[in-house]
Amino acid sequence: MGTVEQKSTHTSPPTSPISRARSISGSIKSLFKPSSVQNSTPTVSPHESSPPLGNSDNLKKLVDTKRAELSSSRGAPPVNVNNVSNLSINTDVRPADDQPQVKSAKSPIIQTPKMAMNIVPQNIKSVLSSPRQSSSTNDRSSITSATSSVTSANDQKEKNYGSGNGSADDIPIAQLRLSEQDRAQDYTIDNALDTKDKSKPVKRNNSTSAFRGRKDKNFESSEYEIRSNSLSRIHSTPQNESPTVNNIHRGRPYSESISISSLKHIEQESKCILQVDNFKVFENGMHVHNLKIMPIVKSAQADAANDHDSNELNKQKSMFSLTSIFKSHKEDSGVDNSPLENLDNAVSLLPSIKNMAVYNRKRNISSSTAGTGGSDSDSIPDDLSERMVNPCAAIGAEELKLINTLSERINDAILCKSGKKSSHMLKEKDPDAMTFTQLYGKSMGVVLGHGAYGVVRLFSRNATERDPQYLQTYCNGQKMFFAVKELKPKSSEPKEKFSTRITSEFIIGHSLNHSEKKGGSKYSPNIIRVLDLLEISSGSFIEVLEFCPSGDLYNILTRKTKNGTALHPLEADCFMKQLLTGVQYMHSHGVAHCDLKPENILFHPNGLLKICDFGTSCVFQTAWEKNVHFQTGAVGSEPYVAPEEFIHDFNYDPRLVDCWSCGVVYCSMVLGHYLWKLAVKEKDPLYKAFYEEISSNKEFYVFEEMRHVNHEINRLRKISLYKIFQPNPDKRITIDQLLQSPWMKNTRCCIDYKTISS
């Protein structure tokens, strides 16, 4: 007969040392009552009085009778120690007559000797291991106790579950299915029971329980078959390991028996229990991403002079499009796409490398003096000497000075007559300064994408040990790669608008991902690095950005959709947590993105997520402002725009808009399509259906039908989604609250933010 698979839920009470049903707990305790019997021979405690001499014959007969009973009940040689697991028990002495017995068709009676560690017979395996086993009579073992206290009402529940009749909610969450080899070697209680959540009982709603009770064969055989057990930590005992005291796994801290937490804990590499495309999950709950790298990057390691390779590059360059930074526009047809020339004459608009240390020091001084009202005359002008109330804001005194400097230089370059150099470019260059080619390399002849103001090209150069630390971008060990974005004003656009847009976009990106600490917080790894802004000719500029070789989320979802799949729920949860963490960092620095969508989310091969494109970002709070500035008017891409943005003359909080957009992005990851095209009831029937269901039933069928490998996390996720998609922004959850929700708290992320922030 095939195995009966069951779903599992964690229901361990905080007061019980074992997470399973009370019947097993009682059985184990009765099986291993402290004993004074050793080697099946009863002994007399030294504290007991000797029997009268006159009764010696009766005593001898009694001993012989007991020996005969024990010998007949065994019927098999003693169990080898190598075939059992060890448990920690009490060491009190009790009479031999109260010895519990274990009866089985395959195993003899085991009487526990007087020792700190007792032995579990192999026939307990069927009870301690996963209940998803064959119910064959020959493979089943029974447990019989000498006392009547062993039997309880929960015994029947456990028996029903073992036969496939019990409720799934009675079983611990995250219980892994072990292979036949694992079952033969790993049946200790510590390994058979869940160890992740020891104290919190799980309470499920009716809809979730009903869903779990369905026997959906298609779902059982799907790629999500792993369920909640992918998140538990279970270490299997090696085959060559004898179950001695030193080899016992670490016990649970609330165990009522002898503590073994101080004993040696055997670390074993977790095995992969799920592999879906470029995503792996291990039995300890950890996971790894291995996203595809753009073919152009792989080909860069080969000989670039080979004609065959060059032809292949030209064919493959359109497979990925970094539309996250470089959005497609109708006006692109009027943009000059000719190759960039004379880049070695480009002049950076940023402070020189020599002055960067001074710039960083002034930033820290301005932050440290914010609480005292003090000011530094060299860093903060007189009109900005008032006390700063928000030292963590991305836009402070130094950023304001840099904005003024960049605006002046950009306007000077734009207004300069054709063929003439701006005053900034006429200045004598520092002879020690590195040229553009030395810093960022040469063009690889590949256009990554098209933007509103020009094209984006891929540049690369050989990596060296002397590379500046601030040039943090993708490196494959041989070459460093950079994305170079060209910025040219369109003939139909006012020069002031062009200057304001590129200045604000660069300043926001540059200040957000600055490597130095500001206001006690370190840079976020989920914000793309803006490395440089240079003037290359009269009215033309280039922006150098960190290169992400795995493309954007839009292309990842597009490839998945072509295969008829979507992101795995655990993978989507990890990306969602990274996205929320990056947005939280922006909000804590007074900046809202206002255009979050898959095209604006980039990836590195290891799954590191990067938020980019700050062209429409909103600075809602500077260093001198206590209150948040609200916005009016719709900003961003329609499927991801919150409903309040379409209300005429409505002042909305840009932070809550970002939260709505994050929710739409997540649903796109797990569903593979948009929820709706426009969040307006009168214009989109899909959104109208959502609004009516939420208003009348407080439910949305799309959220109710979403699946997850872990049913408890699925329930928590559903609660969070309902809080995100509140049409009324006053009732909507914030990014900070969402990151503190049970859903995100129970979401494993591949990024260790504690290490980064330390």
Swiss-Prot record:
Keyword Ribonucleoprotein applies? no
* Keyword Transferase part of the UniProt annotation: yes
Which is a Gene Ontology cellular component entry for this protein? cytosol
Which spans does this entry mark as compositional bias, Low complexity?
A: 129-153
* Gene3D superfamilies, A to Z: Transferase(Phosphotransferase) domain 1 (1.10.510.10)
Q: Where does ATP bind?
A: L448, G449, H450, G451, A452, Y453, G454, V455, V456, K485
Q: Which UniProt keywords apply?
A: ATP-binding, Kinase, Nucleotide-binding, Serine/threonine-protein kinase, Transferase
Which BP terms from GO are recorded? intracellular monoatomic cation homeostasis
Q: Which domain of life is it from?
A: Eukaryota
Catalytic activity of the protein: L-seryl-[protein] + ATP = O-phospho-L-seryl-[protein] + ADP + H(+); L-threonyl-[protein] + ATP = O-phospho-L-threonyl-[protein] + ADP + H(+)
Ranges where the record places region Disordered? 1-170, 189-252
Where in this chain does the record put each Protein kinase domain?
442-744
In the Enzyme Commission scheme, what number(s) does this protein have? 2.7.11.1
Biased composition of type Basic and acidic residues is found at 58-69, 216-226
Picking any one GO molecular function of the record gives: protein serine/threonine kinase activity
Disulphide connectivity of cysteines: none
Provide the leader sequence positions.
none
Catalytic positions are: D595
Ranges of Polar residues composition bias in the record: 22-57, 227-247
Provide the family line. Answer: Belongs to the protein kinase superfamily. CAMK Ser/Thr protein kinase family. NPR/HAL subfamily. HAL5 sub-subfamily.
What is the name of the protein in this document? Answer: Probable serine/threonine-protein kinase HAL5-like
Record lineage: Eukaryota, Fungi, Dikarya, Ascomycota, Saccharomycotina
